[in-house]
């Protein structure tokens, strides 16, 4: 719950300790968040408050939605949105359901959705795995898939 450990909170935050290696594995020679930003990629959290329990309640996601919605509106030329983890999928579906009456991402496992081309309006949606926290580096198959998904995103934004 230390804000300095968020993506943009300090020069070497905890969140980037797993994120940077995944981007590097995907072919982006990033050393820091600025390198990722220079590529036209903005990383954010779907939930804007620190996690206080193992799971994140729907009400916690709902509290963050206005901030996430405003944040997304700052990027009118977005080509791709990667949803890194189940909470990101839930939050994005809550936003799209509010706007269109339906979910942009089917409630199917990420593993099954990864190869499906999903769109919200003209924006390509790529469901993937959460890229922060030590577990992603332990779960080698998820790290591999997240890296492959980042490669797909990089190809689409070039």
Predicted region positions:
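Adenosine ribonucleotide-centric catalytic and binding domains
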Residues: 1-37
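Short catalytic/ligand-binding loop motif for oxyanion handling, primarily in non-cytosolic enzymes
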Residues: 1-3, 51-52, 88-92, 133-137
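Short amphipathic alpha-helical segments
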Residues: 5-7, 93-96
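Acidic carboxylate-rich catalytic motifs and surrounding loops in phosphoryl-/glycosyl-chemistry enzymes
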Residues: 32-35, 47-48, 129-132
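Short coil-to-beta-strand
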Residues: 38-44, 123-126
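Internal catalytic-core helix/loop-beta-alpha segment
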Residues: 40-86, 90
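C-terminal capping/extension of enzyme domains
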Residues: 54-69, 98-158
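Membrane-associated lipid acylation/remodeling enzymes share a hydrophobic transmembrane-juxtamembrane segment
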Residues: 77-87, 94-95, 101-112
């Amino acid at each position: 719950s230390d804000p300095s450990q968020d993506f943009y909170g300090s020069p070497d935050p905890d969140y980037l300790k797993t994120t940077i290696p995944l981007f590097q594995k995907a072919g982006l020679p990033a050393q820091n968040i600025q390198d990722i930003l220079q590529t036209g990629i903005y990383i954010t959290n779907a939930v804007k408050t620190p996690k206080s329990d193992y799971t994140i309640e729907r009400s916690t996601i709902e509290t963050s939605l206005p901030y996430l919605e405003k944040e997304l509106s700052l990027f009118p030329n977005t080509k791709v949105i990667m949803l890194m983890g189940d909470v990101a999928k839930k939050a994005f579906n809550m936003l799209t359901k509010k706007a269109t009456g339906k979910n942009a991402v089917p409630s199917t496992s990420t593993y099954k959705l990864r190869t499906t081309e999903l769109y919200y309006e003209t924006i390509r949606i790529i469901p993937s795995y959460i890229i922060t926290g030590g577990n992603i580096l332990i779960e080698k198959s998820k790290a591999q898939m997240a890296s492959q998904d980042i490669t797909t995103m990089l190809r689409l934004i070039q």
